[in-house]
Amino acid sequence: MDKGAPPSIFVNDGSFMERFRQLQQEKDKDKDKVVQVEDSKPVKIISNPKPAANKISIGLKPNDAQKKGGKLAFSLKQKSKLLAPPVKLGTEEDEDDEDVKHEQGFGSVKRQKLEQRDTPVKSAKVSDVAPPPPSDPTVKKVADKLASFVAKHGRPFEHITRQKNPGDTPFKFLFDENCADYKYYVFRLAEEEKLISQTKDSGVLHSGDAGSRTSTAAIPLQKPAYQQTGYQIPASALYDTPVEPGASSRSAQASITRPSDSDSFSGPRGADPLSMMEFYMKKAAQEEKMRRPRQSKDEMPPPASLQGPSETSSTDPGKRGHHMGDYIPLEELDKFLSKCNDAAAQKATKEAAEKAKIQADNVGHKLLSKMGWKEGEGIGSSRKGMADPIMAGDVKTNNLGVGASAPGEVKPEDDIYEQYKKRMMLGYKHRPNPLGNPRKAYY
């Protein structure tokens, strides 16, 4: 190496590594001096440390660790390529300034937390603002009407409307609770419920001032006509314009009693879903009105002969076979029931006997009248004979022996099972014989 050359000029004489090691040792000595000066600085002790100071000391620990780590890095001469970051020396005034800044930052954190606590209240106030109405006027009208109906009659009406109107209908916003139209509907529903609760409260206060009698008479919310008649509101009422209550009740009764031309089994074709819903609601109400009341399981149904001709099983094309009691003629059935302690049948039998009584046009009645007999007197010269005529039905025509009784003859002391058995025997006796086959009388 040429000693006359300046040290900054690189000389390619093979002593490059030795030169580089000397430079690194000089840099390490300079940095060790800087660290010793910083460690020899007097430490400031505070008698009553503030909570902010504690937090500051905790926040400064990583810097101390970095300094110690830097010191260790300087002492390791093998890692010569790792250069520590430059150390900035600060005075005690700088440390005080940092304390003030940390205290200000701690206060700003508190303010941010308070602002975060206040934001839910502000957001709740903002939620009271009405959402924008739907752009489609039909959807807006449907949402308003549906909100009023649901507020009056409960959430089940909304579920029924959702089930009855699937697909692309004006009610499609019910299937997406996050859309703007559904939020508008929920807002309108809350307004309607609030209005109804206010009217109820005002009605209760008014009735309390008027007295107990007027409170029972004055009802804040009267039931609509469709609830009194058991008729459900059709969904097409959501489209109709409000009319007078009297006219609406009359039109509802007329629509129930008088079916329209569009009432067919296929329903109105090419109509909107609301008209279809109204049609099916009206049809269900008519079927419910025409449905017969259910009979108790313990009660024995009346025979088909006592029912209407359209209700008999023989005229029903959907049923096969017959009940044995259907073949009993009405006259025979009346006689049978009159012997079963049936009050209605006994009364009917007495009325029939009065109508079938022998009148003055009878030949025997005329003959006895010529002989001086009067109605109510006995036969004979002493007027003490038989007064009542002999009934032809009591004559024995079944060739029974002496002391024998007919097994199918009903008695008042028979129970319901014995009466039913004998009634079936009577029906078998009068069973039809369309082919005219000879039959033996079993009873």
UniProtKB/Swiss-Prot annotation:
Residues 285-300 have a biased composition (Basic and acidic residues). Its main location: nucleus. Signal peptide: none annotated. Keywords: mRNA processing, mRNA splicing, Nucleus. One of its GO terms (molecular function) is RNA binding. SURP motif repeats lie at residues 142-185. GO terms for biological process: mRNA processing; RNA splicing. SMART domains: G_patch (SM00443), SWAP (SM00648). It is found in: Nucleus. InterPro entries: G_patch_dom, SUGP1/2, Surp, SWAP/Surp_sf. It holds the Pfam family G-patch. One of its GO terms (cellular component) is nucleus. Residues 248-265, 307-316 have a biased composition (Polar residues). It comes from the Eukaryota. Residues 45-71, 83-141, 198-221, 241-272, 285-325 are annotated as: Disordered. This is SURP and G-patch domain-containing protein 1-like protein.
